[in-house]
């Protein structure tokens, strides 16, 4: 029995040593808070407008804080760590299609593009939602239409995001959902991109 306990303790200890913190407490709190805000806004849409508006304003504040952190933060929080150009994203997606993409410790190029798309979409939803509460923009058809289109668009992006997370989790044998909860990922190996 002592050998079993000892082996289990060694396994747990080696797992701790082989993982590194990637996602800061801020990034994790931002991520799950935005998930909550978007879910509440979507569920309350057309039903409980005060709740819908509060969720939208909260999402807008979260986006503003993420923009600041992306420019002034550190490590994997910074945009320059994961924002790549279209050629790099296309090349990465081609590598995915051929099954030879590299594992990234932070966001891979497709994940970075998705972060930007989600931030832009939620920012647009929050902005057009706010515009509808002002005298100048209330009842303006293109503002309402844009709000609805972006609201549906964010659902598509969320589906792609979740699909990408599940795909990458399976492909690289790594639970990325757990990583966004704990902040820790498997340490980079020599063939990974740190």
Language model regions located:
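Membrane-embedded alpha-helical bundles that constitute the cytochrome b-like, heme-associated redox core
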Residues: 1-194
């Amino acid at each position: 029995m002592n050998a079993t306990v000892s082996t289990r303790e060694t396994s747990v200890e080696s797992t701790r040593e082989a993982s590194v913190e990637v996602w800061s407490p801020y990034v994790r709190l931002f991520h799950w808070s935005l998930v909550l805000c978007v879910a509440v806004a979507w569920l309350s849409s057309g039903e409980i407008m005060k709740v819908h508006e509060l969720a939208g304003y909260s999402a807008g504040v979260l986006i503003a804080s993420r923009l600041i952190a992306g420019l002034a933060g550190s490590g994997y929080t910074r945009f320059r760590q994961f924002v790549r150009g279209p050629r790099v994203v296309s090349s990465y997606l081609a590598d995915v299609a051929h099954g030879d993409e590299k594992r990234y410790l932070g966001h891979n190029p497709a994940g970075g593009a998705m972060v930007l798309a989600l931030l832009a979409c939620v920012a647009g939803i929050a902005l057009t939602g706010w515009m509808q509460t002002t005298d100048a923009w209330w009842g303006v058809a293109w503002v309402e239409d844009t709000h609805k289109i972006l609201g549906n668009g964010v659902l598509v992006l969320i589906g792609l995001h979740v699909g990408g997370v599940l795909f990458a989790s399976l492909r690289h044998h790594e639970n990325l959902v757990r990583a966004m909860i704990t902040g820790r990922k498997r340490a980079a190996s020599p063939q990974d991109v740190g």
